[in-house]
Regions:
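PLP-dependent class I/II
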Residues: 1-194
Length: 194
């Protein structure tokens, strides 16, 4: 099973679906949707590509477990597939600009931040600040009114990291990172890290 919801939002090398590899098409269930690449969040539209025998079994479950998607949503999805490539390309370029901005900004703050190659999130490290991810997120929200997701929301290995979305305007990201930089500077002073 290959969840390819972010397949259109990759940076650098183009996405390669596992189903395109020799011998994999007949053994792959590919899952995708419209929420990420076509910005159709909340429409709850998705699709699966798989060998016919598997799709027939999936249909048996689907038709009794889930009601049909509204017709207007289905028409919108068809329109997105037919004519949305230009919009996806523009959105990807915009995300890429914001991605580069955030990575650069966190590194400028002295925080390690790996460059993501897909989706629209960065995962900077705050380990050197001597706070847990939850403490950092709560204190940042309290002091600077900036919300981030603690890395621990994604498991214990996320401790010491934050997840930050760049699905916002560059102007909003600049405003938020100015506040975040001020907060990081204050924490360093309070903890004697400067």
């Amino acid at each position: 099973m290959s969840d390819e919801i972010y397949s259109e939002l990759t940076y650098g090398a183009e996405h390669v679906t596992i189903a395109s590899l020799p011998g994999m098409r007949e053994r792959t269930i590919l899952i995708n949707g419209f929420s990420k690449a076509y910005a159709m969040t909340g429409w709850r539209l998705g699709y699966a590509c798989a060998p016919k025998i598997i799709l027939e079994q999936m249909l048996k479950i689907h038709q009794f477990a889930i009601m049909c998607a509204p017709t207007t949503s289905q028409y919108a999805a068809v329109e997105a597939l037919k004519n949305g490539d230009k919009d996806v390309k523009q959105m990807k370029e915009s995300y890429n600009q914001r991605r580069r901005f955030l990575v650069h900004t966190f590194r400028k703050m002295g925080l390690k931040c790996f460059e993501p190659f897909g989706a629209f999130y960065v995962f900077p490290s705050i380990k050197e600040l001597g706070m847990t991810s939850d403490e950092f997120a709560m204190e940042l929200l309290k002091r600077e009114k900036v919300a981030v997701v603690p890395g621990t929301a994604f498991g214990s290995c996320g401790e010491g990291f934050l997840r930050i979305s760049y699905a916002y305007s560059l102007e909003e990201l600049k405003h938020a990172t100015d506040r975040l930089a001020r907060f990081v500077e204050e924490i360093r002073k309070e903890k004697g890290l400067i």
